[in-house]
Amino acid sequence: MRKINSISVSIVRNTSFLFLCLLLIFKSTDVFAHADHDKVRYVSADGSDAGKCDNASAPCNSLSYAGLQSNKGDRIRVAAGNYVIDDVDTLFYLLSDLVPVEGGYDRELAFEEPNSKNITRLSGVPLEFAEKLADKGFTVIVDAKGVDIEQTKVIREKIQVYERLKVAKPASVCDNGFAGDHACENMDLLSHVPLSSFSTNPSAANDVWGFYDVNDDREYAILGLRNGVGVVEVTDPESPRMVGSLASQSTAWRDIKVYQHFNTETARWDSYAYVTADSASVGTMIIDLRSLPDEISVVSIDETDISAHNVYLSNVDYSLGVALNDVEPYLHIAGS
């Protein structure tokens, strides 16, 4: 199989199996932009809620607006000043760590470093959350305004749901718009694999690719992790089994494709996963899948393109990653 650079981007969905894996997404807003990630978003009391909040010289005004602009891998820096917290969503952004938020910055110094002298005051926050927010560089002013008792109850419930994402969950039927904790429509939850299951202890995940091993009909989910790649066997989707994970450079985005070809000497299908990493310098990781279902390993690293957003296979059966008859398969590296 040859490897070529490509400026085109193709989107392929593997439909060989259904594996529902909610990793760290708990957001009722627009879907994250595919490429606009790993940025700092800036907030200042004298800013303006316009644009993407990613320019230190033109910060946004509110945490809620900055949160809506934020994508996976982003973080929010808040300048010194006074901020009124009067809605549940803003408080959830502050407390959940889905998008890390930190106070104590100086707009005049381009939000470069936090300093305890830069007082970022929050009012309207229930007292029970003051200590956690203090650890993030905020000073909480307790008053009778802002989030009321009912809203405080809602935020507690949201945080509890977020915390429950960190543990494994069994199958759950979609009933009245929910499958367990998860909103649903015409789709049941078969299982939930928390990030804590992976040996590399990732803080987030970013991609998933399905792999059907034609040798033994087993099925796998190959996941791009914040700090590597993991493989979960989902042959029985209600009882997923952790195979293993491989550490790599931290990044908010990886892309994965699998290629299988028949080895006439062993009379078996050999399979490899190709993994690119965006905003990184690790090249294309080639993972040996031939030892599944027992283990995975890195067979080599191709450093022709040390950073790339997408990887794509052409001239293959997209459901299996097997080359089509009488044509040569190609590996495309895009967005390098």
Feature-to-residue mapping (PLM):
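Feature marking well-ordered beta-strand scaffolds used for ligand recognition
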Residues: E112-S336
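N-terminal extracellular ligand-recognition/capping segment immediately after the signal peptide
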Residues: K72-P100, G104-L109
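N-terminal, post-signal-peptide region of Sec/Tat-exported proteins
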Residues: N61-G81, G210-V229
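Bacterial N-terminal signal peptides that target proteins for export
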Residues: R2-L18
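Right-handed parallel beta-helix/beta-solenoid
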Residues: F32-Y65, N82
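Active-site-proximal beta-strand/loop segments in catalytic clefts of secreted hydrolases
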Residues: S44-D46, A79-G81, G104-Y105, L225-N227, ...
